[in-house]
Amino acid sequence: MDSAGQVNHRKQCDGKVSISDGAMSSGADIWKERERSRSPSQILRNELDSLRFYGKGNEKGMPLGDLLDEPDLLHKPKVNFCSPKTPWKRRLQTLAVAWHVGSFIYMAAFTLLAMANPLMWVVMIPYLLYYMVDRTPANGRVTRRYSNWFRSLALWQYYCNYYPIRLHKVADIPPTFTESKANDLGAKKYKMSLKIRLWPLKHSLTLNILKKSDAVEKEATGPRYIFGYHPHGVAALGAFGAFATEGCNWSELFPGIPVCLMTLINQFQIPFYRDYLLSLGITSVSRKNALKVLDQNFSICIVVGGAQEALTSKVGSADLVLKRRKGFVKLALETGKVGIVPCFAFGETDCYNILQTDEKSYLRRMQLWFKRTYGFTIPFFFARGVFNYDFGLIPFRRPINIVVGRPIYVDKKYENPSIEDIDYYQKLYIEELERIFHKYKEQFGYKGMELNYVE
């Protein structure tokens, strides 16, 4: 066999190494060359085949390419629009959800328009100066911006009734704040009182100035809490309704336990939107910030699975990223006098149709790059629109039932908690989470399903 034949023979027999013109190329180089040689239509088709569609009726997933090949899908006689006879309450519920889903876009657009209008500069320049120096989202001062009035707006009742979102209390949780003893001792109802004697009479006149709030003064006597919310779903819709608003009557079910929902710091980079979140008690999920909030006797809620769990979200699934998430347990040990409370939201993953990417697809790489660069990512999803039921970013009307479990108390403060201590409390946490899941799964439509820990 001559030298040219030997080269051709080696190209055919060796799948990993080929010799041509005296140079060696790895299997990865060959793969890249093949990728470049594919036509755009082939790449598009492979990407479609790598996407799996998860929705009602397709809980096990279906390749998107096969779904698009179905003749009924692309030849629907008409778009399924909302009926004009829809009750006005349902319309208001849809608008409340549309506001929440797109609120960051609306406020970002308002900011750009206000900056472009010279008439608004008298407002925008002082605000932007304040925006640049204010560190409230990261220094624990969200407790000063926490507005019970804003959290209690009727808007949030409409938001929660849309799905609906329901909170289920399965155990009594001692309140953090109880009525102060000063209330029983006839504490002054006014900030300033002036007593003037009407001489020469023995009578006097009392002038009361600046009446105090009618709210009963309270003091911190009980433990604080770290609520762990599972699963994340696409956007943790249930966590927002239950923990960031009074739409589910949080203060009635759990009186004396003010709670701050924690999210990524990126959301506080949009002017006005950051102040909107802070007034709802939403703050950043950094360790330093969480410790400061807990030090002020406020409880916190953490969506434990985070962005990584969002990528695994499927309709009707119970896939959790939890085994390797121990930071919230360590946070409880370092604080002391804290209860760790598992919460499971049945139906959180059912509100959107999901397009899940394959590990080797370009779309998956784009999602992971976005997560590495910006700290978060979201799956590809769709549901319905404001005026139609076929396509849009408004979630479906699917019930979300949030079961709040029993607290796992950490009485002692650990200066430097060991791995064994963290694992011990995490095990207790997982056991309680599994208990409430198995006890209530049949009641809320998860019969026959098991918790699946993907990480």
Show which residues each predicted segment covers.
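N-terminal signal-anchor transmembrane helix
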Residues: 132-223
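Hydrophobic transmembrane helical bundles of multi-pass organellar membrane proteins
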Residues: 114-152, 157, 161, 168-176, ...
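Catalytic core of membrane glycerolipid acyltransferases/transacylases, capturing the structured
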Residues: 122-154, 219-296, 306-324, 350, ...
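Short, conserved catalytic or adaptor-binding loops enriched in Gly and charged residues
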Residues: 156-162, 250-254, 395
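Non-catalytic C-terminal accessory region of glycerolipid acyltransferases
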Residues: 2-75, 180, 292-455
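Signal-peptide-cleavage-adjacent N-terminal segments of secreted and extracellular proteins
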Residues: 48, 52-88, 149, 163-176
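Alpha-helical bilayer-embedded segments of polytopic membrane proteins, i.e.
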Residues: 78-130
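Alpha-helical membrane-targeting segments
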Residues: 116, 147-151, 155, 195-208, ...
